[in-house]
Amino acid sequence: MERLAAAITESLIKKADYYIDLHGGDDYEELTPYVYFAGVAKPEIVEASRKMAEQVDVPYMVQSNVSTGGAYNYAASTCDIPAVLLERGCMGTWEREEVDSMRRDVRNILCSIGAYNGIRSHSTYYPLKMDDVRYQCASVNGLWYPVKKPGDIVHQDEYLGEIRDYEGNVKEICRADMDGVILYQVSSLQVVEGGPVITYGNIVREKDERKTRIAQYWTRRSDSFLEQRRAELHSALAGRWMTELKKHLPVSGRFRILR
């Protein structure tokens, strides 16, 4: 195994300019889509990794605070290669939409770094940054009963779930150490001592230059936006939709497009 790892490192990783790792969660985990970017590396490598993460259509991006524990972290910290890890899909299942989203994310990243001349998505994504992530593990063997779902917002000391024994006795209560958003948690009933239970991160409250760009964008559009929307509502396409919708309404019903 060590020889295989060495061969992959020398023949592939060290010859790469960028590193994109695609993950789908373990069979026993449910998660909300998010992306990691390398955070323990030279400043220019961290910044390049972050810019890659900003191309991904997910709600959250997590700045990794370790240099090991993943090939993408090794690539950035040891080989000076900007790196990200995408998490989408979970519990050993997949959907066509998830596959298409992952392909679109990879294409957008490749376009952003100049490695692909294809058509990038016209959308601009704004994943919220997290750099304080808590990985809570079980202190006992038992059965896990969560009360939250991935993507839920939690507050410090909030009850997240409990671990019981086979007789139903509560052996451990899990509470949030801080405010945050649940990224993933164990979806299986059984958990083992020292094994993962739930993970959540705190959204960074920092000045984000992207917010300024958003405000400027909508400021430029504000003067003509209402006029444009009204024109669209009175277009030929809107008229065809009205005709189709009226076919399915009661005869006495009234229907109009609000504007």
Predicted regions and their residues:
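Structured catalytic-domain cores with a bias toward divalent-metal coordination
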Residues: 1-259
